[in-house]
């Protein structure tokens, strides 16, 4: 009798443990993004609008693009922001030297790099503060920091297509807001974002990977410029190196956060 009672107690204990395990919430699988260790630099290179007065367009884009990248799988702690007029601890003072030093430090152990610059531009390069950052110098900065790692470079500025020849490497994707001989739009004093940056934010919300993002941004900018009656479209440029091209569909963004 005592043996039967002991056996019954053991069975009850086993049953209770099984019920407890069955009722416990399932363990969550650890998920990671292919971009969660990438080095990212996002730069707002000017504070002046097209008319010379102050504008928030570039800093709005810098702040919100950094946030959207974090939402899609980039580690917020690895995203470094730069502004000509930083208004919070999130952004550092934008100079070519500071950008290069930060990119070099952050990319040392990173598997990939992303550089995003939004500013005014001219056929010689992109504005960073009171200086022009030319394509060959930006190219050297990225060569010496990111090297052969997968790298995505986005330049949102007038005439930004001039950066493609200097930056094009087999391991890189280059996306620019305009052809080398065209202006881009939306950098006035009253604009919230430049058109290109606005489209980047919209398309990044749901895009699967960078190649889809780039094509979507091109289409979005073209549609916006038609709506606005732009007579000479900016024609954003895409260049994808042969080493990176087959990898991009595998480097998928994390699922967007629920609204």
Language model features: what each stretch is:
Residues 54, 58-65, 95-102, 134-141, ...:
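Stable alpha-helical elements in mature extracytoplasmic
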Residues 22, 26-111, 186-194, 240, ...:
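Boundary/activation segment at the start of structured domains
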Residues 46-50, 85-89, 119-125, 131-132, ...:
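Solvent-exposed loop/turn segments at secondary-structure junctions
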Residues 152-241:
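Active-site-proximal C-terminal subdomain of hydrolase catalytic domains
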Residues 1-6:
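N-terminal secretory signal peptides that target proteins for export/translocation
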Residues 39-44, 78-83, 113-118, 151-156, ...:
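Structural recognition of the beta-strand scaffold that forms the well-ordered cores
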């Amino acid at each position: 009798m005592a043996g039967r009672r002991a056996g019954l107690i053991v069975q009850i204990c086993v049953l209770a443990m099984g019920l407890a395990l069955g009722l416990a919430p399932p363990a969550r699988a650890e998920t990671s993004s292919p971009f969660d260790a990438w080095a990212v630099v996002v730069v707002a290179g000017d504070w002046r609008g097209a008319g010379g007065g102050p504008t928030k367009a570039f800093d709005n884009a810098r702040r919100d693009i950094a946030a959207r990248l974090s939402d899609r799988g980039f580690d917020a702690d690895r995203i470094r922001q730069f502004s000509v007029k930083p208004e919070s601890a999130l952004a550092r003072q934008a100079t070519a030297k500071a950008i290069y030093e930060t990119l070099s430090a952050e990319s040392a152990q990173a598997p990939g790099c992303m550089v995003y610059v939004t500013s005014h531009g001219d056929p010689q390069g992109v504005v960073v503060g009171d200086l022009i950052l030319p394509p060959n110098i930006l190219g050297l900065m990225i060569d010496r920091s990111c090297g052969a790692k997968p790298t995505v470079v986005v330049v949102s500025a007038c005439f930004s297509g001039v950066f493609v020849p200097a930056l094009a490497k087999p391991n890189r994707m280059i996306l620019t807001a305009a052809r080398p001989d065209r202006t881009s739009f939306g950098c006035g004093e009253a604009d919230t974002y430049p058109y290109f940056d606005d489209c980047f934010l919209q398309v990044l919300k749901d895009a699967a990977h960078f190649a889809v993002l780039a094509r979507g941004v091109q289409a979005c900018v073209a549609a916006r410029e038609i709506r606005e009656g732009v007579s000479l479209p900016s024609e954003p440029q895409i260049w994808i190196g042969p080493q990176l091209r087959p990898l991009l569909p595998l480097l998928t963004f994390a699922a967007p956060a629920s609204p």
